Amino acid sequence: MAKVLFSSFQQTGISGSLKSGQLSGVFINGTNLKSNAHAKRFRKNSTSSITIRCCASNSPTLENTKLAGAPEKRQKKKQLPYQGILHVPGDRVEELDTRETSLLVAEVKGWLMKLASGKGEISPSAYDTAWVARIASESDSSLPEFPEALEWIINSQLPDGSWGDDRHLQLYDRVLSTLSCLVTLKTWDIGHNSIAQGTKFLRENMIKLKQDDGDLLSGFEVTFPMMLHEAKQLGLDIPYETEFTRLLEISTKKKLAKIPLDKLHSAPTTLLYSLEGLQDLEIDWQKILKLQSKDGSFLSSPSSTACVYLKTKDRKSLQYLQNAMEDQNYAVPCHYPIDLFESLWVVDTIERLGIDVFFRDEIKAVLDYVYSFWTNEGIGWGSTCLVNDIDDTAMAFRILRMHGYNVSPDAFNQFWLPGDKFCCFVGELSHGVSEMLNLHRASQVDFPNEAILTKTFKYSHDYLLNVDSAHMDKWATKKNLMGEVAFELANPFHDCLPRIYNNAYIKHYGMDDLWIAKTIYRLPLVNNKVFLELANRYAQQCQLYQPAELTKLVNWWHSSRFEDIPSTRLTANIDMLPYIYYVICATFHEQEFAQLRVFFSKACCLNTLFDDLMDCATSIEELDRLQNVIERWDISLSHELPLEYRIPFQEFYNTVLVMTEAASKIHKNLSPEFICKYLSGIYTKLIKSEIADARWKIEGYIPSFEEYMENAEVSISTWVHVLMSILFCGEPLTEEILNTIYDSRPLKLDRIICRLCNDIQTYKIEMKLGQPTQGVSCYMKEHPGATEEDALVYLQSLLEKTKRELNESYFITHENDLPKNIKRFNFEMVRMMLITYNETRQVDLFRNPDNELKDMIKFCLETYRTL
């Protein structure tokens, strides 16, 4: 039914103070946004609400239409229980400086083009730079090969005597980095003052180290003990015997004992990343060279590669280190390169913040680069990395699939271990929350018959549901990772609208997030102030046009005189207008889709109202008369209809004329006559299907499930909003496209999904309201002995299957495919429906709104000022 989508948003609380006549304005805390839309700024954090107000005047009549016999105005309705709940921020947005936005966009475009060429930015690692600085010159062993690295070490010591990230004190990182720098300085016998300050820091802080609380650095159990051993040999005055070091020694011995040397020498594993910590093992360093990446590194680790060079004097290893030093301004990071990881996370961040509208071409270039390294076994963090991981593979799989690249979920098979467990790397002992979150997100873009993604979804979902809120992630220190997890679990991919998702992530996004490897590091192109400022600016920009568009819709409602319809069960009223409007704003938010938003909102109102009327129908004779008028599509026959049918038909008719005029200006290749026939045909098809529904109800007829679905797929009406709105979605259209689009596979899947999710959630309520014809009852009639639960299981399985088919239809480009924005609108129409009838909701949101849905709509209205 038409109301299934829009009615739920009717409950979110924007109040309407309405009288018949000319619209006076849309008010926030008494300020008229119609006359003062962008000039006023309200107090920040004030609790303002929207009121729609009209001044008294004679009600305008419909053009070319005279409504005879209209009843007197009804008494003002008492306020509905859901009114007055939703508030918009008191801090009104002003016109934005587009020059500043343009500068931000230009800066980010520069970053993306750098990533597309394999370049990026990562913070230097004192630990790794110190390892590289140990290397002696080939021509004179008394001199360093990289004197600039030694100079950087001395100049980068922090005021407290330590080395490491200067904006965040992570004790393990500071101690390890400081120890590495001291060993290097002591080896070259330089920087005595720096050594003194560094040893003082270690003496004061090593005793503060505690047993692993889940925040140890990657490989710390092997790298730190080895550094202690070397420091002791050099005579550094630091505490070697502490409770922590004793416990760590026990843990390290156990870990080293489990390492199979044959595997270490024969196949690339994560052990290659920390070879400098494995020097006590009987390693054949010449065999290790066979596991070298093509760039000369060992798993893109400068410190591990430096260790191998010190053992072997391998020229390829040295060349890698020389390249890294030159490229990174003589202070190497803990990963080099990290190009695939960085590129994927930059694109993901841009899309989650909702600013990808500025960077379509640049994102395509970055993803082309990433895709060139995709394999059937997944992907690693760098283009030369020989070990793939589930985190990068999941992120790459999801983003590449959503952008139409051909990627196979078989890449996840290698991460599935005996005992029904997934791992990030082979040999991993514990999970990180962030990797499971990315796996969970990737699992939701599945196609039919992809069993491995069913496994990944269940595994990651169960893990995230049960993870301790105090759990420390292995791979990142983020602003609010558990907040991200909670939001993702509550808002599955198909059940969340774009701007709701974007605005939520604006709250969770951290400009100063840290990443964890052998040391902590930063990715300035992933976490920065520019992204957040641009995201906030765009969120505000999306609000600038809203008052004028909503005002236009309110004026239209009053000119249509819907409130004159005499029906005691009519739930459609002007209060639903803001909710319908903000739903489409949360989806097609771009400024160029202004006409689409307005006409979509009108279509939703009309369909909701007419669906209500069909639910109330009791006369076969009146239905026959209505069908005759609809099929002939003749406004002169509207006087034959009772008032409750006459008013909406006249508005259907007038809306088609208005839309025809607007669409004709856009699609000059299409005649107005063709467009008018196209639009009237849509409404004719819809209304005839709703008449059939009403006829079945009056006659008490329960059809077979197949017969029911054939009509119910039409009466659900969501396809109507798609077919009408595509005229304004910015795509060139032809008569052939418009004549065949209804029968296209995406539209067919849309109709099935929307009907099924409606029936699954509302069948009990509709039975109580005397509407026995719905999917559950038809299935039970066709399968004698089947219970309601049996019917629901069948409908739910059919729904999930069809959602996977919709994913495939949307993300994969097919021959003779629909234009991109049409596919997008169709997909988002389904998401609008699914967010309304989420499987966790067991009520009819048309009559019983819930706080969760209200909160979601608040996201559409909020402007975040976090800078």
From Swiss-Prot:
Q: Where does substrate bind?
A: 255, 474
Q: Which cofactor does it need?
A: Mg(2+)
| Positions contributing to Mg(2+) 4 binding | 389, 391
Q: Which InterPro entries does the protein's record reference?
A: Isoprenoid_synthase_dom_sf, Terpene_synth_N, Terpene_synth_N_sf, Terpene_synthase-like, Terpene_synthase_metal-bd, Terpenoid_cyclase/PrenylTrfase
Which UniProt keyword terms apply here? Answer: Chloroplast, Isomerase, Lyase, Magnesium, Metal-binding, Plastid, Transit peptide
The pathway this protein participates in, as annotated, is: Secondary metabolite biosynthesis; terpenoid biosynthesis
Location(s) in or outside the cell: Plastid, Chloroplast
**Span of chain positions assigned to the transit peptide in the UniProt entry:** 1-55
Where the protein is mainly located, per its record?
A: plastid
Entry binding sites for Mg(2+) 2: 611, 615
**What SUPFAM superfamilies does the entry give?**
Terpenoid cyclases/Protein prenyltransferases, Terpenoid synthases
What name does the UniProt record give this protein? Answer: Bifunctional diterpene synthase, chloroplastic
